[in-house]
Amino acid sequence: MIRRSSLPVLPAAPVDLVAVAVGGHQVILAWTECGAGGLGFRIERAVRNSPCRSFVEIGEVGPHVAAFRDGSVKPRTTYSYRVQAWNASGDSPFSNVVEVTPPQHETELPAD
């Protein structure tokens, strides 16, 4: 007798990850979800000039949420980000890696 697994297949990797610094203390991330079946996304960050430069998980979002706000960044520090989908079967490959450096001064929006 052949038994089929009831576990879902691994989710596909998120694609088109982008990062935008909003002032000196926030970074907004956005990506495209590829396919269904994920239970959420893990967001990881690394600091460029740190001794280890290893990625560390900084947050999670639920399924069909394709954005994240990192409010724990410092101005003039370069950060790398990547995102991974997950489900009961395991983790997807990572998305593309993006880098962003928040500016020293807050971003000013033009007046209307």
What would you call each of these model-derived segments?
Residues A30-T32, E44, Q84:
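Residue-level recognition of well-ordered beta-strand positions that form the cores
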